[in-house]
């Protein structure tokens, strides 16, 4: 191993970002998706950064551009966050909210606050995913109360649906049914999360034009009726298309190709979601191959079936749209892949 790496296009990062800015949206990049690209966004755009863990703050220099998303915090963590200058927060339960409010009673400062709300998920995977956020009746109760709090400057709501969301974008109708008029009149910001689909072998992004139409519909309605700003929180949409994973063929036997990387240090998304990465140069007709990672795990498979034209040992296998949730594990002491920026 050692030759495999991620190759990230700076221009593609900025191009994906601009697609969202052209819709008239504020953007907060979801850092957990691929933190290494934060520097490009921070230096070249006005992006904010949605961060969930204290240690991830190292990827951003300007703390005024951070939205810190709380989970089970305490006074000690809040002290550290305030010392760093963070003043934008998202909370998803009343316990964490109460911790923040008590802390603010002793601070002579103002914060911007979003309450995370849960939306109904239409999925067959019941019990697989934790559901973040408060119920709409909690949001309807809390927002008017918080509007009176002198420690809160901008106030708003946050939600986030599943990754690769191709169908559930009827935001305006859902929000207008779930939230009372008084609630919407008392907010300044509304973060609609991410979930914009990206093209893989087993998924499509062809519905993006319709999705963008529904987002703009919501944004314009929210601004006209309630003078509130819409924020979108992309991760995969920016990171994936910007990144290719370059590997080398170590061996070929029968119809199996072994490469010098693993899903465990290059594409955990393959196991978790699961997605199937596109392969540069794959063809419609030809011999079928399995592309397997270098570990002894039988699940270490990038693609079960891909048609390639005369692959040879030493050739490159390049995976496309490979920049989302490509974090490494310590399985078999695998090294973390290098990240190379181009253009």
PLM features per residue range, with description:
Residues 1-111, 144-148, 152-153, 184, ...:
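A charged N-terminal "starter" segment
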Residues 30-36, 52-55, 71-73, 92-96, ...:
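Active-site beta-loop-alpha junctions enriched in small/polar residues
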Residues 37-43, 222-223, 309-310:
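A short acidic-Thr-Gly-centered motif at the start of a beta-strand
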Residues 49-50, 113, 190, 230:
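Residue-level marker for buried hydrophobic side chains located in beta-strands
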Residues 121-251:
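Active-site loop/helix belt of alpha/beta enzymes
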